Amino acid sequence: MTLLAVNGGSPIRSQQWPLWPAPAPGALDALNEVLHSGRWAISGPYQGKQSFERRFAAAFAEFHEIGHCVPTSSGTASLMVALEACGVGAGDEVIIPGLTWVANASTVAGVNAVPVPVDVDPQTLCLDPAAVERAITPRTAAIVVVHLYSAVADLDALTAIAERHEIPLIEDCAQAHGARYRDRRVGTFGAFGTFSMQHSKVLTSGEGGAVITGDAALSRRAEHLRADGRTYTPDEPAVGEMELAQTAELMGSNRCLSEFQAALLLGQLELLDEQNERRRANAALLDEGLGALGIQPQVSSPGTTERTYYEWAGRIEDDGIGQIGVERIAPAVAAELSGAAIYASYPPMNHNRLYQPATRARFKGIAGLDLTGYSLPVAEDAGQRVVTIHHSALLGDESDMKDIVRAFEKVFANHRELRG
């Protein structure tokens, strides 16, 4: 008899889950203001009022208690801007985690450098500092650390390594908006913090991004790189003039945020701390409930003082269930929950199907881009056994968390139905 919903059985839940993205109060008014402002981008003519983009940049910098923020069109753009602002280019190597979204590797290749994936810590699933140390060569031009899912990486060790070798550390905070390490917001420890505001993120405008830095010179380089070689004007321009100055200091590309996106982000930012607190409370319930089923929750580094959840993540410890693979288990759990956002972990970077530089003509002749030869045993294990739950589910209530636990319990009890 078939019991699992994924095989045609009855699901344990039919109610819908919290909708994400959820607009902040006043979002429609803000969008209407942009719509009728005569200015839809930072590159549009000044209309006597500071752009939403510059207002968001100031607010995001203040949120992080840091001097500078440069908005960008996406998280990928923010990482590309940070890499190039740090001087990374042709022939350089950039250390990245072996477990992360594909953009960390493809963006490094996009600046004509070579991604070097290293293994992750089995508890945090973030960069293993010892593996980073072993991977450094004379060609290493940057280290990209990703604060993955809900964990903050070991920034004490990683900043020490970067400083000792005089290599820029770039924090990819696309999954860690608002997290704190030793009471400082993440993104403020390296040369740059980079952020994504893509649809699924806890701070979103559909697409978007930003870089933050405490270094005025790096910020100025970032401004040039994302606005076709232009920077913000130091003084208020006249009505009808540009709020961007053509300096001819550094050639750039167009990776700017639109005024619509910036207007949305200003409202969303005001809700972030409150939403993160709700996610933390529900994550604690999952830690207890799913932990009792033999799913080991991801932990954060000891210096973490405020954790945030892009996704709750945990490793299935039972060998009999774990060997089935999260690629089968996650959809089965989601089916029990009427399509809740339950996913398998990212695949390891040495087996990531989305990373295919050989399919792009621009990468011909660049040696070292094939990552299949790297050994990443911890990342490979995570790809087989780590399951994740998107933060939108964590905006529910205690009964929702109980449903998630019940769904896993049912799938685990009937896991033999999933064997091929």
UniProtKB/Swiss-Prot annotation:
The modification N6-(pyridoxal phosphate)lysine is found at residue 201. GO terms for molecular function: pyridoxal phosphate binding; transaminase activity. Pfam families: DegT_DnrJ_EryC1. Keywords: Aminotransferase, Antibiotic biosynthesis, Pyridoxal phosphate, Transferase. GO terms for biological process: antibiotic biosynthetic process; polysaccharide biosynthetic process. Pathway: Metabolic intermediate biosynthesis; 2-deoxystreptamine biosynthesis; 2-deoxystreptamine from D-glucose 6-phosphate: step 2/4; Antibiotic biosynthesis; gentamicin biosynthesis. Signal peptide: none annotated. Its EC number is 2.6.1.100, 2.6.1.101. SUPFAM superfamilies: PLP-dependent transferases. Catalyzes the PLP-dependent transamination of 2-deoxy-scyllo-inosose (2-DOI) to form 2-deoxy-scyllo-inosamine (2-DOIA) using L-glutamine as the amino donor. Also catalyzes the transamination of 3-amino-2,3-dideoxy-scyllo-inosose (keto-2-DOIA) into 2-deoxystreptamine (2-DOS). Belongs to the DegT/DnrJ/EryC1 family. L-glutamine:2-deoxy-scyllo-inosose/scyllo-inosose aminotransferase subfamily. This is L-glutamine:2-deoxy-scyllo-inosose aminotransferase.
